[in-house]
Design a protein with these regions (language model features):
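Glycine-rich phosphate-binding loop at the start of an alpha helix
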Residues: 49, 73, 98
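Short, functionally critical alpha-helical segments immediately adjacent to catalytic or ligand/cofactor-binding
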Residues: 47-63, 101-108, 118-123
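Substrate-binding/active-site groove segments that recognize
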Residues: 69-88
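Export/targeting segments at the very N-terminus of extracytoplasmic proteins
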Residues: 5-61
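A short, structured beta-strand-centered segment in the mid-to-C-terminal lobe
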Residues: 90-99
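Secretory-pathway/luminal and periplasmic proteins that interact with or process carbohydrate-rich
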Residues: 60-67, 86, 127-128
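Catalytic cores of secreted/periplasmic lytic hydrolases that degrade extracellular macromolecules
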Residues: 30, 34, 38-41, 50, ...
């Protein structure tokens, strides 16, 4: 039975083979602080910090405005062009760690309704 398409703008794809989990300890303190600021701005519980940080680490290793040439994904949470509008200032938010985090938070809670659910999905599929 084929996998059910759950989100119209993201095609079903297989997980990454040979994937190794990245440690959150490599994310700079300034980026972790930006995540906490974004969580406050988006009224997200502090209890979700570790799950959000973990997702960010797997997606970008905490590198602001990072680009993925293969998918055109961008930023700390690797938003696709269709999600750029989730950032407070759209595409202009890239380069601002707090605003990139806000866009990622909005994507995660809009699609998965919790950071824990998004992390669980990521751990199973190696993408979100």
């Amino acid at each position: 039975m084929p996998a059910k398409q759950t989100h119209s703008h993201r095609p079903i794809k297989s997980g990454k083979h040979g994937w190794l989990e990245k440690s959150t300890s490599g994310v700079p303190p300034s980026i972790q602080s930006a995540l906490r600021e974004a969580m406050r701005a988006e009224s997200v519980s502090d209890a979700d910090f570790n799950d959000l940080l973990w997702i960010m680490t797997q997606e970008s290793a905490g590198i602001v405005n990072t680009h993925n040439g293969a998918s055109r994904a961008r930023g700390l949470f690797q938003l696709l062009r269709a999600q750029y509008g989730l950032n407070p200032n759209g595409e202009a938010s890239f380069g601002d760690a707090k605003e990139e985090c806000q866009g990622g938070i909005r994507y995660i809670y809009g699609r998965y309704h919790s950071a824990h659910a998004a992390r669980s999905f990521w751990q199973h599929h190696h993408w979100y």
